[in-house]
């Protein structure tokens, strides 16, 4: 058996691959052994005595199928879990995510003049104090707050109107009483 170490090394550098990927024709080993330069190796490649093997395909089809199943919720039971709940999904990350969502909503509402700066501050502190579980709860709280504000404004305006009416009627009554007193005198 002829040693083809040199030829393998040259062929690997010419074909830009590893020596394991080379295929040297076993029937023409004597002719291959005569090649001692890159040019002669190129000629052998052209003749088909030296070839570069195709890479072995490493299929990901099974991995894709497994991932698809995991997305459906398979293979995620208690037996498959290694870390604690906090290690798998840190509560701090969940908290930060929630705060960012709520604060973004509050900023948007303040910019759109849906809430004033005082309400913004009140809701901001409330969200920081874990008062609102999610965005929906916060929006609901804002609506309730606005409804209460409208109701209280309406009540105060009604009270003001009633007060003004009472004052006017009292003044009229006093005026009448003075006129009656003058007539009597």
From Swiss-Prot:
TM stretches of this protein: none
Give the coiled coil ranges.
none
One GO MF annotation is: structural constituent of ribosome
List the protein's name. Answer: Large ribosomal subunit protein eL19
By sequence similarity, the record places it as follows: Belongs to the eukaryotic ribosomal protein eL19 family.
Q: What's a Pfam family this protein contains?
A: Ribosomal_L19e
The organism sits in which domain of life? Eukaryota
**Keyword annotations of the record:** Ribonucleoprotein, Ribosomal protein
Q: Which GO BP terms sit in this record?
A: translation
Against PANTHER family, the record matches this protein to: 60S RIBOSOMAL PROTEIN L19
Looking up InterPro entries in the UniProt record yields: 60S_ribosomal_eL19_sf, Ribosomal_eL19, Ribosomal_eL19_dom, Ribosomal_eL19_dom1, Ribosomal_eL19_euk
Name the species this protein comes from. Answer: Tetrahymena thermophila (strain SB210)
Q: Where is this region: Disordered?
A: 152-185
